[in-house]
Amino acid sequence: VYRLFTSMFLHFGIEHLVNNMLVLFVLGSRLEQVIGKLRFLFIYLAGGMTGNIFSLILELRNQDFSVSAGASGAVFAVMGAMIYVVIRNKGWLGDLSMRQILVMAAFSLYFGFTSSGVDNAAHIGGMIAGFVLAVLIWHPRKKRDQQMEIYDQL
């Protein structure tokens, strides 16, 4: 069971680590400002674990086992949560639009599916988990308070 957690902190090389951290920096810092540190941490860790569990279930089903490492499932959970937050904020969060997030997600998924050795199941599982977790744990304040929070970010 611990491998489902610890694999989020291992990477197959510097490029793998840098790609994950770049997306995490761009989206994660904004998401954390809106939903708070504890909710962000919960979505990151639980979303990453859920992505890894989703991957494991598919591996067991297909009897096709491989080594899995990386924060991608957790990063995709952040992406999924960010999609929900932006939907709730009428398509924008500061200077970040829904279109930009969806393009980032589409490119990330495209590169995953066109490259070998990528755990796409963890990516998709993480993204779904992040979206669902955000729905369950983030309830924006009244519209006026939420707008003021967005303006404070600018």
Predicted regions and their residues:
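A detector for small-residue-rich transmembrane helices and their helix-helix packing motifs
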Residues: 1-154
